[in-house]
């Protein structure tokens, strides 16, 4: 399927943060410079993805692609805990993450935990959940490299799962409908709608 020597390569992590949001708190609309991974650890958030909104629940991940308009709002009754990573990546496998959201499995959650641990070593904690943090002045040996490795591992696992799911599942009947909850989203979630 992928003819590239490197079908997926993480080229940098601009910033990353894990923070708890107050209900109703939201980010201003802006355009992604690179890719943006959003993972909801607890609670719920509503993500703006260009012209439509996606409700993410605990255990779900979403990717905003470069040049996509995005914003996030904390919704529900439980203050959500959200992990966000702004990164750059290339390779043909990254196409599978365009308009993608899905629930994580155990292997992917394990990678995400390792990534979150190294993010805490590399980036300063944020006071305001809407802000992305600055890098720490002193980073433990290999911290930047390990976070890149863990992110790449997570992306490879997700790309493989999406590839398997597409081969095994019939297309979502609502996928063709422009106003459907599935829209152009990952067929992985169609069964949950």
What are the functions of these language-model segments?
Residues 97-126:
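Aromatic/histidine-rich interaction motifs
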Residues 70, 83, 96-98:
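N-terminal helical cap/lid subdomain that shapes the substrate entry/recognition surface
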């Amino acid at each position: 399927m992928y003819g590239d020597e490197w079908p997926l390569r993480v080229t940098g992590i601009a910033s990353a943060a894990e923070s708890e949001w107050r209900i109703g708190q939201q980010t201003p609309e802006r355009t992604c410079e690179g890719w943006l991974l959003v993972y909801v650890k607890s609670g719920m958030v509503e993500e703006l993805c260009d012209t439509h909104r996606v409700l993410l629940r605990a255990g779900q991940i979403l990717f905003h692609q470069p040049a996509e308009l995005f914003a996030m709002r904390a919704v529900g009754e439980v203050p959500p805990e959200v992990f966000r990573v702004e990164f750059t990546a290339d390779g043909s496998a990254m196409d599978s993450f365009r308009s993608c959201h899905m629930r994580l499995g155990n292997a992917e959650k394990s990678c995400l935990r390792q990534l979150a641990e190294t993010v805490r070593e590399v980036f300063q904690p944020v006071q305001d959940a809407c802000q992305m943090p600055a890098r720490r002045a002193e980073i433990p040996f290999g911290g930047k490299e390990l976070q890149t490795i863990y992110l790449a591992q997570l992306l490879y696992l997700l790309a493989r799962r999406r590839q398997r799911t597409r081969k095994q599942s019939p297309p979502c009947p609502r996928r063709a409908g422009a106003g459907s909850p599935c829209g152009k989203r990952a067929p992985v979630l169609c069964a949950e709608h």
